[in-house]
């Protein structure tokens, strides 16, 4: 059977490669051959190699329209309602994903977002009405534009944990705290394709409010603090090698002193470059030492999310301070210049979490 009748196979395949990710659900419904083709990992490798992939920044972002109000005594406390917004970096277009199943009151607060292949994984968070810790897992497929409910995270309630993915199949989770605010040293891995959780060996120390990245085949957990050191962020880091299934320390001084006042927002590039946004500084690690490579623009210095594009350029999302509009910038590493991304009133709400997806 031909991909497209009366067209050479190479030309027909090129047509599929050039399609927008938003057309994937429609393409999958055309015929089984198209559905199978766009589901193959080779399709996305060819799409990326030919320069037709699309870079997306996916955010847990508050709605800007009138917020839902929670009445407490004589006071009215505004409670932002969060939803998932998508920024297409190539075009600047923004959109919103369908609501997460069973969450008419918005996304769980402080949930974590991770991309795995062409899927988005939403992990845990706090119920926006009761503020109870959730162990829920939801997976959104950009191929079908549908949600599915994943297996709940085991091990009891956990919030403010670090997570990262290998971008292919697995999501790694570590640290955070339980319902009694006790910092945790346990870690888990979630196989998205198999919808299966497994426990990893414990880390070497408790790490609440830590951050994480995945690169060079390792899951790196950075900073955080123990139960007895509430708010005193550690300079240390440790990494989990998926091949040896073991943790190893990254040294007692992985972070510099000025980077422990508040947890840095980190990102790792495909070439191994490691960047961190810390207060007003853009930092880069070279030869195991952090160097300042630039100043963050004033209206984005309260950073919510940072990602490294395939070109090596950085995308930073944030605001001047909490309550101010969220904006985005692209940092060109070739000339160290910042370019402000186009803004839209509808998508200026506070951002709690984000992830990067190339599809």
Curated annotation (Swiss-Prot):
Q: Which residues form the signal peptide?
A: none
* F-box domain ranges (all copies): 2-49
Q: Which Gene3D superfamilies did the record assign?
A: Kelch-type beta propeller
Q: Could you name the domain of life of the organism this protein comes from? A: Eukaryota
Q: Which InterPro entries match?
A: Kelch-typ_b-propeller, Kelch_1, KMD1-4
Please provide an example of a Pfam family that matches this protein in its UniProt record.
Kelch_6
What is the recorded name of this protein?
A: F-box/kelch-repeat protein At1g15670
Kelch repeats: from-to residues: 119-167, 170-217, 219-269, 271-310, 313-358
PANTHER family tied to this protein: GENOME ASSEMBLY, CHROMOSOME: A06, OS02G0208700 PROTEIN
Query: What keywords is this UniProt entry annotated with?
Result: Kelch repeat, Repeat
Biological processes per GO annotation = negative regulation of cytokinin-activated signaling pathway; regulation of phenylpropanoid metabolic process
Q: Which GO terms describe its cellular component?
A: cytosol
